[in-house]
Design a protein with these regions (language model features):
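Conserved alpha/beta core of the MobA/IspD/sugar-nucleotide pyrophosphorylase nucleotidyltransferase superfamily
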Residues: 194-198
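Single conserved hydrophobic/aromatic residue that forms the stacking wall/gate
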Residues: 214-223
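Short loop/turn motifs enriched for small/polar and acidic residues
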Residues: 44, 199-201
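Acceptor/aglycone-binding surface of glycosyltransferases and processive sugar-polymer synthases
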Residues: 69-73, 77-87, 101-185, 201-215
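Broad structural signal for hydrophobic residues in well-ordered alpha-helices, predominantly aliphatic
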Residues: 59, 145-146, 223
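Structured catalytic core of nucleotide-sugar glycosyltransferases
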Residues: 1-132
Length: 223
């Protein structure tokens, strides 16, 4: 059972996701309403070049929990996530992608783990639906590199589906590409961290905007 006094902030950075964002918000609202969570939705439009902004404007007229932050240009996921964090009011903050590959049905599990005493819950896409060469292999290499260098052993640093206690978010300042290192930064702050398996779905609309050129060693670690 949910704590009705507890506010959950759900942050969704988007870039050119006009086809998927409406379906995603419907799914999130259905899950949160079924579990009787008190929640807010924050969608950060990271300089989309399609009609994402127009779609979001229409959605705000129908969804009372929804607020939209619009960035003037495409600043990247770290800046978009940081803008969402800065405007969130929840006791627990959830992040997920806007492309429907993260499954909103996993959100209640993450919230439950936070309420069990953890500060950060990280999703692990143990059965990824990406193409092997394009996504899985570079991701696996990056995860091993980050784990070996930082000492924090996670299977999936790149999964956007995460849950944070608000006070952990307040202690972390993001810049550059540091959203990839949120678990490491939280660990430095003494956070209790747990990784759990989550569902991963195939992309139904559009194409991925993720480039894996950042997975070279110098750019991955900011040197």
């Amino acid at each position: 059972m949910s704590d009705i006094k507890q506010l959950i902030s759900i942050i969704i950075p988007v870039f050119n996701e006009s086809e998927s964002i409406g379906f995603l918000l419907d799914e999130v609202i259905n899950v949160m309403s079924f579990h009787k969570f008190n929640f807010e939705l924050i969608v950060v439009n990271d300089g989309s070049k399609d009609n994402t902004q127009q779609v979001l404007k229409q959605l705000t007229l129908k969804i009372k929990e929804l607020s939209v932050i619009s960035l003037r240009k495409n600043y990247g996921q770290t800046a978009a996530m940081s803008a969402g964090f800065d405007n969130s009011k929840g006791d627990i903050v959830i992040t997920l992608d806007g492309d429907l590959q993260n499954d909103p049905n996993d959100i209640p599990i993450l919230i439950s783990e936070i309420n069990n005493g953890y500060d950060l819950i990280c999703g692990w896409r143990f059965d990824r639906k990406d193409k092997l060469i394009n996504r899985k292999i570079p991701s696996k290499i990056a995860n091993k590199l980050i784990a070996n260098v930082t000492g924090l052993k996670l299977h999936d640093y790149g999964c956007s589906l995460k849950a944070f206690k608000k006070e952990i978010i307040d202690d972390i300042k993001l810049y550059g590409e540091l959203h990839r290192f949120l678990p490491v930064l939280a660990n430095i702050e003494g956070a209790r961290i747990k990784e759990i398996k989550v569902n991963h779905r195939s992309r139904q609309y559009g194409t991925s905007t993720v480039s894996y050129t950042h997975l070279t060693l110098p750019t991955t670690f900011g040197v």
